[in-house]
């Protein structure tokens, strides 16, 4: 009979690995941003980098639920894991990111919607399918913009139909999805993690930071 061996990691080893993961993600975020200073263009660069580096799980390989940095090192993951990597990158480059999966009624697919904060509002993007919507002024659509979906146009690589329903259907409840959204990014940053431990900052669980500005 196989025996389970438990490795008890000493505190110094935990701290060292925590620091290494933080440093890795800062380096990846800097590389992915490519020096771009405009927030919208930078976010789209981060989307492109994530999709180029993290591919869908190869056929025959299992889904592995582990640390965000391991997803990048492994170079594959599912839709939620791509969303985790992307929102971690946006958080590290100054725009807080969160995500949650949503499947509209009648759809045979789901979309991991990513929410990226910009000046008190939240852009909405779909990393797995490479899609988002734009306003008439050419800006990435925010949660508030989806109150008038007829004014928006589909951009990126996402199809017009997905899972048997119009692609826009996956964005029909963005405010509700946002209220359930979460992030693990800030929890791997040393300063934020310390504040969480001593209770001065909430954990990055669902709805931890449901901030919406009225239009």
Predicted regions and their residues:
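Loop/turn elements at helix/coil->beta-strand transitions in domains of secreted/extracellular proteins
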Residues: 38-44, 91-98, 119-122
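Active-site neighborhood of thiol-dependent amide/isopeptide-bond enzymes
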Residues: 52-113, 117
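A residue-identity detector for tryptophan
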Residues: 12, 19, 28, 49, ...
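Secondary-structure boundary elements
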Residues: 1-74
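Enriched - but not universal
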Residues: 15, 31, 52-54, 58, ...
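A general marker of short, structured functional hotspots
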Residues: 3, 8, 14-15, 21-24, ...
